[in-house]
Amino acid sequence: MLNIATDEICSLIRYRIQNYNSELKLNNVGVVFKVGDGIVRVFGLQGAMAGELLLFEEGSVGIAFNLEKNNIGVVLLGDCTLIQEGMIVKGTGKIGEVPVGDKFLGRIVDSLANPIDGKGDIVSSQTRLIEPPAPGIVDRRSVYEPLQTGITAIDAMIPIGRGQRELIIGDRQTGKTAVAIDTILNQKGKDVKCVYVAVGQKSSSIAQVVTTLQDKGALDYTILVSAAADTTATMQYIAPYSGTALAEYFMYNGSHALVVYDDLSKQAQAYREMSLLLRRPPGREAYPGDVFYLHSRLLERAAKLSDSLGGGSLTALPIVETQEGDVSAYIPTNVISITDGQIFLSSDIFNAGFRPAINVGISVSRVGSAAQPKAMKRVAGKLKLELAQFAELEAFSQFASDLDQATQNQLARGKRLREILKQPQYSPLSLENQVGIIFAGTNGYLDKVSIENIPSYITSLTESLKNEKSKFGDVILSTKDFTKDEENVLRNILEAS
């Protein structure tokens, strides 16, 4: 007969009852009920936050973009082909962040900072939010350090300072990217880390930029964020924010960073596409009502930090494309009002053979003059005045049949001054060379040189300045000033050449 150990069974039941865990694990989940065009509609997830990362059953990640009464509009960060109706979606309680660090220098990454250059994974223990708050007023100080672009026309008349936001604007194929790349090339040896964000560009164009940076030795201090034309609208939308997060790492560590957005017109178009698919009300040019905030919250992150925060800086060079030179369109006017100045590139000047095709008349730098080196300030004032007078005289001379000798001389000098502002692509000039060339032009040393021979004259002048580097170049680089002593050295060089 079977003996039942009732005491043992009772003690086991008692033990189980005492140690019973009645805690319920709750997961905030939703269900996919519509998917298409990179947009997913999710039912449920009542506690989801705007901008929260959502995890789909098959591993995809999306961002909660529209919080509506009965559902959530989610934009996907990847491919939507594997997502099906009825799939479970979980909230993560987190917002987007990307890994950051020095190891990203020299690498090409996507909008989520994943490497796409085939050089292996990037191991980083630090992360930054894709959209953190911008530095406050107390956290900033005024712009006072120059950021040399190496382009004479910009450094002389539209100077840029570290921490400034300077818009590069113009029609397609007018050299906007070339100006930005020249600026990156000129940061070599200046302890400025660069981030180039390509939004909606052709893959071949991005490859060309990479090749240029590699050939010139600039990729070592540059991070390239690629959101090519074949990526989703969401990836193109977040690429500038991710690129800024990578640059902010250097700024908050006391270094100087430069970020180029090429270009924000494409980002606005991607945002418009997402908004229209989410059925947001369209406004002017079919852009949503918050498209100004799209760019203002991005560009406000550029700053010159106060000494208490390390004194780092983040300089932004956003690029915006215009149609037929129309700067009064929606996106151009928005970005012009957000930035601290603009460099306007004109297709007429470009087609006339002047490169870089900068229209100095309507280009402006609102805060850069405070950062311009004294040496440049001393020679650039005269250049601006003479070019302005030349532009006025040139327009007048078209209607005049005979001109007096003084006017003819002024026109001849103006043509030579315009000639010295021409510069080959990917050939940035150092500060001492720029000062020497402008001084030669404004003080009449080029008046007897024919316009065709000016490029060769400039080449020989830069060689002469290199030979006298200890007396002229080194002094200007160390003091950033152009005193009588340096002027006498320069006059001797010019008279000898």
Curated annotation (Swiss-Prot):
E.C. numbers: 7.1.2.2
Keyword Ion transport listed: yes
Entry keyword set: ATP synthesis, ATP-binding, CF(1), Chloroplast, Hydrogen ion transport, Ion transport, Membrane, Nucleotide-binding, Plastid, Thylakoid, Translocase, Transport
Reactions it catalyzes: ATP + H2O + 4 H(+)(in) = ADP + phosphate + 5 H(+)(out)
Lineage top rank: taxon: Eukaryota
Site (Required for activity): S363
One Gene Ontology term of the molecular function aspect: proton-transporting ATP synthase activity, rotational mechanism
CDD domains reported in the protein's UniProt record: ATP-synt_F1_alpha_C, ATP-synt_F1_alpha_N, F1-ATPase_alpha_CD
Cystine residue pairs: none
The keyword Membrane is annotated on this UniProt entry: yes
Binding site for ATP: G170, D171, R172, Q173, T174, G175, K176, T177
InterPro entries: ATP_synth_asu-like_sf, ATP_synth_asu_C, ATP_synth_asu_C_sf, ATP_synth_F1_a_nt-bd_dom, ATP_synth_F1_asu, ATPase_a/bsu_AS, ATPase_F1/V1/A1_a/bsu_N, ATPase_F1/V1/A1_a/bsu_N_sf
GO cellular component assignments: chloroplast thylakoid membrane; proton-transporting ATP synthase complex
Main EC class the enzyme belongs to: translocase
Main location: plastid
Function: Produces ATP from ADP in the presence of a proton gradient across the membrane. The alpha chain is a regulatory subunit.
Family in the record: Belongs to the ATPase alpha/beta chains family.
Subunit structure and binding partners: F-type ATPases have 2 components, CF(1) - the catalytic core - and CF(0) - the membrane proton channel. CF(1) has five subunits: alpha(3), beta(3), gamma(1), delta(1), epsilon(1). CF(0) has four main subunits: a, b, b' and c.
Listed name of the protein: ATP synthase subunit alpha, chloroplastic
